[in-house]
Amino acid sequence: PAAVPPSRALRDGREYERLNLAEHFLLADQPPKDVPARFVVLGQVRQGRRAKAAGLALLSRVAVVCCLADAVSCCFLADLGQAPEGQWLEVYGRLEPLTDPKLAKSPPPGPEASVSACNERYRIVVEAAEPVAPPEMPYIFEFRDREPFAW
């Protein structure tokens, strides 16, 4: 079998592109051919009132463009099972259209960012999720529009 490049991960016989949540947030608005069919992202579990009522949670990571004053918590809705608030997860999945965009409205601000933005068009269909230690640098500073992504 061919080796999997470092920009990808192999799980259960499927190949996933590694990218960060901010990159995925930006790519989700592009033509479908530009969005990875399967991906792996790293994020922190957050609870939102509307999401929780629908059996979902927010997978979130703070993106910084210039400085922490302009930080935005980028979020996607996902079924993260019983993962506790604040848990870091490596999530393997794919996108699916969000049937109720109201679920993504007004996500609670995260502890590190005063602004949260939840993707209102798509949710992550979780194929696998693994608890991981918090990253050394929890913030996203780099955004790429093609592979290899910043992960």
PLM region spans:
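OB-fold and OB-like single-stranded nucleic-acid-recognition modules
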Residues: 1-151
